[in-house]
Amino acid sequence: MAIGTPAHEFRELNEEELVNRLNEAKEELFNLRFQLATGQLTNNRRLRTVKRDIARIYTVIRERELGLSVVPGAEA
């Protein structure tokens, strides 16, 4: 079963929301790596999930730059 946020949910967000989600995910990844280094991390799988979410967000942003995907609410 897939864990994390599916790409279609990211595609429904506008540019500002995507950037906010990206910043939150990067901050969470930083905190998880810090916990791993100090031996406090209990869920190692979360690292992988957050990294994949970050990659999905970057993919959606790049699709929009290339015109492969449309921004929701934007008039064509």
From Swiss-Prot:
CDD domains found in the cross-reference section:
Ribosomal_L29_HIP (cd00427)
Q: Which UniProt keywords apply?
A: Ribonucleoprotein, Ribosomal protein
Pfam families on file = Ribosomal_L29
Q: Which domain of life is it from?
A: Bacteria
GO molecular function terms listed in the Swiss-Prot or TrEMBL record:
structural constituent of ribosome
The cellular component terms of Gene Ontology attached to this UniProt record, alphabetical and capped at eight, are: cytosolic large ribosomal subunit
Q: Which GO terms describe its biological process?
A: translation
The question of whether Ribonucleoprotein is a record keyword is answered with yes
Family designation: Belongs to the universal ribosomal protein uL29 family.
The cross-references to NCBIfam families, in alphabetical order and at most eight, read: L29
Query: What protein am I looking at?
Result: Large ribosomal subunit protein uL29
Upper lineage is: Bacteria, Bacillati, Actinomycetota, Actinomycetes, Mycobacteriales
Which gene underlies this protein?
A: rpmC
